[in-house]
Amino acid sequence: MNSQQCVIIAIAGASASGKSLIAKTIFDELRRDLGTDQIGVINEDAYYRDQSHLSMDERVLTNYDHPKALDHQLLCTHLQLLKSGEAVDIPCYSYTEHTRTADTVTMTPKKVIILEGILLLTDPKLRELMDASVFMDTPLDICFLRRLTRDVAERGRTMESVISQYKKTVRPMFLQFIEPSKQYADIIVPRGGKNRIATDILKTRIQHLLAK
């Protein structure tokens, strides 16, 4: 598979803005046409830096909403390898341990790769690899309520810790890094991941890129 046959789509926006939902919708609908082995999803969270050398007390103090918390260079390298036809081993990140695990997930080359993550559009080198990009423009208060519910139910967090993190880093970093990166998006999606018109537009764009 050569680089011209690999379409990379990025879905960015605040935490809990609907990125995963629209990514799953696109994945489920396109795999019927392309086949499951020809489309893949990469979550930016997998590229949080390894913190196994730090104590748990130190790990919880990390600002996970700052671009420096992520190894975007490794993500760029993996995308370049996938575009050139090589498989990669994607790290696995533990939200409860706040570091990578010893496991990896192997991804083989795909016709379509969907990236999803909060800070994807902040990195110029990543943007150069994208064929199309989306920003989920969901109101921040709605994102916070969704995040609070999700992190307590699915990620072993306490309500107090989620609220504290939101005040200290999530909201400030959104305003400093994530929201300004909206200017680089090709498509801005209001009303979250259930926006059917936006989903259809993105699917059409992917199909057009594949037909080139």
Curated annotation (Swiss-Prot):
Enzyme superclass (EC): transferase
Catalytic activity: uridine + ATP = UMP + ADP + H(+); cytidine + ATP = CMP + ADP + H(+)
Principal localisation: cytoplasm
Pathway info: Pyrimidine metabolism; CTP biosynthesis via salvage pathway; CTP from cytidine: step 1/3; Pyrimidine metabolism; UMP biosynthesis via salvage pathway; UMP from uridine: step 1/1
Pfam family, one: PRK
InterPro entries recorded: P-loop_NTPase, PRK/URK, Uridine_kinase, Uridine_kinase-like
Any one GO molecular-function label of the UniProt entry: uridine kinase activity
Residue positions binding ATP: 13-20
EC number: 2.7.1.48
One BP annotation, GO: CTP salvage
Gene Ontology CC annotation, any one: cytoplasm
Keywords in alphabetical order: ATP-binding, Cytoplasm, Kinase, Nucleotide-binding, Transferase
Subcellular location: Cytoplasm
NCBIfam families: PRK05480.1, udk
Family: Belongs to the uridine kinase family.
Name under which the protein is recorded: Uridine kinase
Biological classification of the source: Bacteria, Pseudomonadati, Pseudomonadota, Gammaproteobacteria, Alteromonadales
